[in-house]
Amino acid sequence: MDINQNLGNLMKEAQKMQQRMQEAQQQLSQLVVSGESGGGMVTIKMNGRHDVTEVKIKPTLMDEDIEMLEDLIAAAVNDAVRKIEKASKEKISQLTAGLNIPTDLMGGKEGE
């Protein structure tokens, strides 16, 4: 296969990847996860754009130490962020799994 044919194939694959990435971003923006802390005492809902869309706090926590409540909120947000990041990585892995990019153009050797 000559270099022009390889480059043509690479461009086609890049266009497919760009379209897939746009579709994935759309799907991920609609994803909603829940992050929890304190055994469900604090629950955060977050979408794929990392926007917090809902915060639920059990009423019994309102009588507790404010620092504990702050820590629980931070932990719930961090839990939601980790879930979004995991979902994003899984989606990207799915997208790149089917791509046919010649490894000799990527700095490796064919078959690596």
UniProtKB/Swiss-Prot annotation:
Q: What is its main location?
A: cytoplasm
Keywords attached to this Swiss-Prot or TrEMBL record, sorted alphabetically, are:
Cytoplasm, DNA-binding
Name the source's superkingdom.
Answer: Bacteria
**UniProt signal peptide:** none
Spell out the Gene3D superfamilies in the cross-references: Nucleoid-associated protein YbaB-like domain
How does this polypeptide assemble, per the annotation? Homodimer.
Which named protein is this? Answer: Nucleoid-associated protein LPC_3038
Provenance organism: Legionella pneumophila (strain Corby)
